[in-house]
Amino acid sequence: MISGIINLKKEAGMTSHDAVFKLRKILHEKKIGHGGTLDPDVTGVLPIAVGKATRVIEYMTEAGKVYEGEITIGFSTTTEDASGEVVQTTPITELDGATVDQAMASFEGEITQIPPMYSAVKINGKKLYEYARAGEEVERPQRQVKITEFVRTSPIELENGTARFTFRVACSKGTYVRTLSVDLGVKLGFASHMSALRRTASAGLTLDSSLSLSQISEMVEAGDQSFLLPIEFGVQDLPAVQVTEDDAKEISFGRFISINSQEPLVAAFLGDKVLAIMEKRGQVYKPRKVLSQ
């Protein structure tokens, strides 16, 4: 069994689940998961965990993400992106860049979002997009997210009653960039939607070092496994502690050990190899997930 992290460059037109399905065939490995779902039309970084690394994927998804995309102001859609049907049109003939920049900056910090109807959030055991496809709208719970950066990265192009520009956003997990694009339009007094998006960074992985499915397939055929990052990459956001060989034996048996730390969760290392995720219990630590077996 192979184990590790893959920095996958997801292409447009496939779901995150599709990408995992295809990788299972390429790698001949059933135990594969992804961190951070991307909508079918969204491209870019999709963290993939293989084998034992699936046990640490949850610790990777806590990291922030960076996206680059395009916002179109002038009409809104059912899905808040370019794939939906037009809902409202508000023709625009002029838009000042400074006004847009000021409005974008107002979203930086902690903000509240309501998930879009076309999303995978579950309400009463049913995904929101299932309600939406049935023509139903349900009340959705608000969520707190953090926007570290939200900036315009191109001039504003005015054409056929619309205004388009590209942007970059750095945000916490759970942020809906589609909704952010719509809310920006509301602040400016116009209908809007997100017309393109790609994820350029997630869980410490960046787009410039990501690999497509075809590239990975070619490497596998050539016997090259350099596309696999070590499982240690998946715990880099956790505090790391070094343990002794005696401690390592205790950990392998699932026993408590003493660690000089106050952190609720730590990654226990013996040298450069991660042994386990350890959880603080009173004055000692108990293995939550043993990774060395």
UniProtKB/Swiss-Prot annotation:
SUPFAM superfamilies: Pseudouridine synthase. It is an enzyme of class 5 (isomerase). GO terms for molecular function: RNA binding; tRNA pseudouridine(55) synthase activity. Signal peptide: none annotated. Its EC number is 5.4.99.25. InterPro entries: PsdUridine_synth_cat_dom_sf, PsdUridine_synth_N, tRNA_psdUridine_synth_TruB, TruB_C. GO terms for biological process: mRNA pseudouridine synthesis; tRNA pseudouridine synthesis. It catalyses: uridine(55) in tRNA = pseudouridine(55) in tRNA. Keywords: Isomerase, tRNA processing. The active site is at residue 39. Responsible for synthesis of pseudouridine from uracil-55 in the psi GC loop of transfer RNAs. Belongs to the pseudouridine synthase TruB family. Type 1 subfamily. This is tRNA pseudouridine synthase B. The lineage of its organism: Bacteria, Bacillati, Bacillota, Bacilli, Lactobacillales. The gene is truB.
